[in-house]
Curated annotation (Swiss-Prot):
One annotated GO molecular function: UDP-3-O-acyl-N-acetylglucosamine deacetylase activity
Pfam families assigned to the protein according to its UniProt record, in alphabetical order: LpxC
Organism: Aeromonas salmonicida (strain A449)
EC numbers on record: 3.5.1.108
Cited InterPro entries: Ribosomal_Su5_D2-typ_SF, UDP-acyl_GlcNac_deAcase, UDP-acyl_GlcNac_deAcase_C, UDP-acyl_N-AcGlcN_deAcase_N
Protein name listed in UniProt: UDP-3-O-acyl-N-acetylglucosamine deacetylase
UniProt catalytic activity: a UDP-3-O-[(3R)-3-hydroxyacyl]-N-acetyl-alpha-D-glucosamine + H2O = a UDP-3-O-[(3R)-3-hydroxyacyl]-alpha-D-glucosamine + acetate
GO BP terms, alphabetized: lipid A biosynthetic process
Active-site positions on this chain: 266 (proton donor)
Family statement: Belongs to the LpxC family.
Role according to the record: Catalyzes the hydrolysis of UDP-3-O-myristoyl-N-acetylglucosamine to form UDP-3-O-myristoylglucosamine and acetate, the committed step in lipid A biosynthesis.
Lineage summary: Bacteria, Pseudomonadati, Pseudomonadota, Gammaproteobacteria, Aeromonadales
PANTHER family: UDP-3-O-ACYL-N-ACETYLGLUCOSAMINE DEACETYLASE 1, MITOCHONDRIAL-RELATED
SUPFAM superfamilies, A to Z: Ribosomal protein S5 domain 2-like
One GO location term (cellular component): membrane
Length: 307
């Protein structure tokens, strides 16, 4: 049986919010079966819980944010969400003492490190997957995103299109099949990126206040400003993949199917996920409970403990 997963024990980290610039303390705590991913604002009295849910994503300006009916939010959850998806974590409490998840180094890798540090515990309940049965497509101008049936696991085909000297001659398309490819190896270290020409405006809107060369790839009109350059040749498109993985994990389940997109972003990713979930005949929940069942997606499995 492919089982649900949580952590063996709790772990804590401190960082800076990308947009708020505020110091944030974040704690991961194990959660019981069928809990899902739940964000907890511990700086509020009483503590406010915001479960990961596609319908609760109410702000997608430069990040993905969960916002409840009272306006309480947890922003910039996409990189952590991608790490949880990549590690196959089903149940977790994420405590934060601020309205934003810390940006760390701008990728999912520091979150992966924290999860690996304490280890994963398999739980005594079957892991549920969302399997795509019918194709779904959403558009916004020339941008589009779509799901297609793909029974062998989860496959991504994503293309970006930036008109900038750094992108010229660089591969802006990436195709990965996660039935064999590892999220940790292929995607997790790709950092968020931005342009110097946008920063002054963003900061005037109280955004990107915590952004720096330590947690983002920054480009001027001609080149990458980070002294160490890029972590891989296709870091830009792979970071967009990372964002999409995090955005699509707002359904709290891994997806069995193919995701294709052109110039997508947080808003379009969420729009696609909502369109899928609203069309009940387009998907089904499946489990793998037979003896010796194999997961259709390659998850990190070092140091697993069975609950």
């Amino acid at each position: 049986m492919i089982r649900q997963r949580t952590l063996k024990t709790s772990v804590q980290a401190t960082g800076v919010g990308l947009h708020s610039g505020r110091k944030v303390t974040m704690t991961f705590r194990p959660a019981p079966v069928n809990t899902g991913i739940v964000y907890l604002r511990t700086d509020l009295d009483p503590v406010v819980a915001l479960p990961a849910n596609a319908d609760q994503v109410r702000d997608t300006v430069l990040c993905t944010a969960l916002v409840n009916e009272a306006g309480v939010r947890v922003s910039t959850i996409e990189h952590l969400s991608a790490a949880l998806a990549g590690m196959g974590i089903d149940n977790l409490y994420v405590e934060v003492d601020a309205p934003e998840i810390p940006v760390m180094d701008g990728s999912a890798h520091p979150f992966i490190y924290l999860l690996q540090e304490v280890g994963i515990r398999e739980q005594n309940a079957a892991k549920q997957f969302v399997r795509i049965k019918q194709s779904i497509r959403v558009e916004d101008g020339d941008k589009w995103a779509e799901f297609h049936p793909y029974r062998n696991g989860f496959k991504m085909d994503l293309e970006i299109d930036f008109q900038h000297p750094v992108f010229e001659g660089r591969n802006q398309r990436c195709v990965l099949d996660f039935s064999g490819a590892s999220f940790v190896k292929e995607i997790s270290r790709a950092r968020t990126f931005g342009f110097m020409r946008d920063i002054e405006y963003l900061r005037s809107q109280n955004l990107a206040l915590g952004g720096s060369l330590e947690n983002a790839v920054v480009l001027d009109d001609y080149r990458v400003l980070n002294e160490d350059g890029l972590r891989c040749e296709d870091e830009f498109v792979k970071h967009k993949m990372l964002d999409a993985i995090g955005d699509l994990y707002m359904c709290n389940r891994s997806i069995i199917g193919e995701f294709r997109a052109y110039k997508t972003g947080h808003a379009l990713n969420n729009k696609l996920l909502r369109a899928l979930l609203a069309k009940q005949e387009a998907w089904e929940l499946v489990t793998f409970e037979g003896e010796g069942a194999k997961a259709p997606i390659a998850y990190y499995d070092n140091g697993l403990v069975l609950a």
